[in-house]
Regions:
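N-terminal helix-turn-helix DNA-binding core of bacterial DNA-binding proteins
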Residues: 4-45, 71-79
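Short, hydrophobic-biased segments on the C-terminal half of alpha helices
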Residues: 53-54
Length: 117
C-alpha cells in the first residue's frame, strides 16, 4: 500500500461515525448491510451516511453492490489487510519474538473460519 493511500484510509477512519460504520460492516461480513439499514443502526440521517460511505469507499475500505433496489455495503477486507500490513511492515525491527503477541491477538478473530476451510 502506498503511503498516500494509507493516510487517506486512516483519515477516513479518524471520524467517529465512519469508524463505527466500518466496524459494523466488518462485523457483518460477508453478507454486508444495506445503506439505509446502516443509517438506522447508527442513528445517522441517510444523506449523512451516504457521504460517510463515499469517504470510506474512496479510502479503499468499503465496497458496494446494487441488489435490486438496495445498495449493499461491505467492508473491503483486502483494503483492511493492506492497511494492517502497511502499519506492521518492519514491525519490531525484525525481532519476531516481539511481534508474536501482536500476531496472536490478530489471529483468533478468524481462526475458526480458517479451520473450517
Amino acid at each position: 500500500m502506498e503511503r498516500s493511500l494509507a493516510i487517506t484510509a486512516l483519515g477516513a477512519l479518524a471520524q467517529t461515525t465512519r469508524l463505527e460504520t466500518f466496524r459494523t460492516l466488518v462485523r457483518h461480513e460477508p453478507k454486508g448491510v444495506p445503506a439505509g439499514e446502516l443509517a438506522r443502526m447508527l442513528d445517522v440521517p441517510q444523506n449523512t451516511m451516504s457521504a460517510h460511505l463515499a469517504t470510506l469507499s474512496r479510502a479503499g475500505l468499503v465496497t458496494s453492490e446494487r441488489q435490486s433496489r438496495s445498495i449493499i455495503y461491505r467492508a473491503d477486507l483486502d483494503g483492511l489487510r493492506e492497511l494492517t500490513l502497511f502499519l506492521l511492515k518492519d514491525c519490531c525491527g525484525g525481532s519476531t519474538e516481539l511481534c508474536a503477541p501482536l500476531i496472536a491477538e490478530l489471529t483468533p478473530c478468524c481462526a475458526s473460519e480458517v479451520e473450517k476451510s
